[in-house]
């Protein structure tokens, strides 16, 4: 079995068996956005009142984040895709390493804990192995707000400086438009004293979703979605009910899968302007895109090569670079894919070449000559988006493919294979019962088998 990383090995606890040369047809329901839900869970720490989150996807990352909040003292009740969170009895301001390991989003807790309680201890974050994602912007921004920060033995220890009880609003200019830093600083500044301005802020839809929920809670945040965000700190925040926005990355993945298989599908619900960079490139490459309300329909017969360069929103999302590389690998003509966000996000290239692609990699640029077909293989995905790219490749390929490393896929796609089945793809999840024995959390294509969040 070929592994997505030459330096790592993965337990083959679960894999997907894909019968190739499939076509997609029908309507697929898009789940709530993982990257939004994770930060909204952290934001619930900012109030003592109840927060109700709707449209929360059932994913291993969400379960990990919920367990982190429970450990802090948050009471969580789940029903279907709805979470009720009660943070009034938080007694711990420290996140244990064993719970945060592998979940980068755990670091979001530092802003709310510091701003609300004046102290926080959070391990350095983990996540997908796609290169360096430093937290310098988070740390420098929190220091500017009045935090004293010490990093010892991979633990970030933060306190409010001196005898002050609150962070103090200030002007912060980010060196780069970091999504995580923007979100961390917005949450921290929402309970700070005075006005905070964040320049060169990230503009991603998930940030806008966070600001919308915080404003429902009583925050005073202006101009989210713009390069300069203004936050007037308030004394306290209240509870609210909020629906997580649709996942634009999941939506884009299905659109790309449809284009790669010359298929026609409709995705819904979506927010079309969140997907503009993707749909524009799909249209440029030969797909017909029809937008109607909160749905997008794609029809595709022939694909031609087009160039893309990843960029912060509203540019082409880095999270869809790997799936789009798969599409370009079977397009007519040549194309060039340039990754500008992460330095190690081309793990899929040598695997696609094993399947028959013709891709030459020069640092962060993939030069692609389209081929007519792929051949099915047994492969292991090394990260979340590589796994999605390989599944699309398996659907295109002649013969059968087996994709392992599903612990990555299950972090970011809710019931991915069952949705593909609904669209007509022959795909089966296989379990290694011996390995699964000690697993606390698993995802199944059968909704009845999906573990519920326990009431705490």
Swiss-Prot record:
The compartments listed are: Cytoplasm
The record places the active site at 128 (proton donor)
Q: Which reaction does it catalyse?
A: phosphoenolpyruvate + UDP-N-acetyl-alpha-D-glucosamine = UDP-N-acetyl-3-O-(1-carboxyvinyl)-alpha-D-glucosamine + phosphate
Pathway info: Cell wall biogenesis; peptidoglycan biosynthesis
- Give a yes or no for keyword Transcription in this entry: no
Uppermost EC category: transferase
Q: Which PANTHER family match?
A: UDP-N-ACETYLGLUCOSAMINE 1-CARBOXYVINYLTRANSFERASE
Protein name per UniProt = UDP-N-acetylglucosamine 1-carboxyvinyltransferase
This protein's species is Prochlorococcus marinus (strain MIT 9301)
Q: Which gene encodes it?
A: murA
């Amino acid at each position: 079995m070929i592994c997505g990383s030459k330096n790592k090995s993965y337990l083959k606890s679960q894999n997907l068996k894909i019968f190739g040369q499939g076509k997609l047809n029908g309507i697929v329901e898009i789940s709530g956005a993982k990257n939004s839900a994770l930060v909204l869970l952290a934001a619930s720490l900012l109030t003592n009142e109840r927060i109700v989150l709707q449209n929360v996807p059932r994913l291993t990352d969400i379960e990990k984040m919920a367990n982190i909040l429970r450990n802090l003292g948050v009471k969580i009740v789940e029903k279907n895709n709805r979470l009720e969170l009660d943070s009034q009895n938080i007694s711990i301001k420290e996140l244990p390493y064993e719970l945060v390991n592998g979940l980068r989003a755990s670091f979001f807790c530092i802003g709310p804990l510091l701003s609300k309680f004046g102290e926080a201890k959070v391990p350095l974050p983990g996540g997908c192995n796609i290169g360096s994602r430093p937290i310098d912007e988070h740390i420098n921004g929190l220091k500017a707000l009045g935090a004293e920060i010490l990093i010892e033995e991979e633990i970030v220890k933060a306190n409010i400086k001196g005898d002050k009880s609150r962070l103090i609003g200030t002007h912060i200019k980010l060196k780069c438009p970091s999504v995580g830093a923007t979100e961390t600083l917005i949450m921290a500044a929402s309970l700070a004293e005075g006005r905070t301005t964040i320049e060169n802020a990230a503009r991603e839809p998930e940030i806008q979703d966070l600001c919308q929920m915080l404003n429902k809670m009583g925050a005073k945040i202006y101009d989210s979605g713009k390069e300069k965000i203004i936050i007037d700190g308030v004394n306290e925040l209240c509870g609210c009910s909020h629906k997580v926005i649709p996942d634009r990355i999941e939506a884009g993945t299905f659109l790309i899968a449809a284009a790669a298989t010359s298929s026609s599908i409709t995705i819904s619900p979506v927010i079309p302007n969140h997907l503009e960079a993707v749909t524009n490139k799909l249209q440029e490459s030969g797909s017909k895109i029809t937008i109607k309300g909160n749905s997008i329909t794609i029809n595709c017969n022939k694909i031609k090569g087009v160039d893309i360069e990843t960029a912060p929103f509203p540019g082409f999302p880095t999270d869809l670079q790997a799936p789009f590389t798969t599409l370009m690998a079977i397009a007519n003509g040549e194309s060039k894919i340039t990754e500008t966000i992460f330095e190690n996000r081309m793990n899929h290239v040598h695997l696609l070449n094993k399947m028959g692609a013709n891709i030459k990699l020069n640092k962060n640029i993939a030069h692609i000559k389209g081929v007519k077909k792929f051949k099915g293989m047994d492969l292991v995905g090394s990260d979340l988006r590589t796994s999605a790219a390989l599944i699309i490749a398996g659907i295109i390929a002649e013969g059968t493919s087996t994709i392992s490393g599903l612990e990555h896929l299950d972090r970011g796609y809710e019931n991915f294979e069952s949705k593909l089945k609904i669209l007509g793809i022959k795909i089966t999840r296989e379990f290694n019962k011996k390995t699964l024995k000690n697993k606390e959390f698993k995802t199944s294509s059968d909704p009845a088998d999906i573990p519920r969040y326990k009431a705490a």
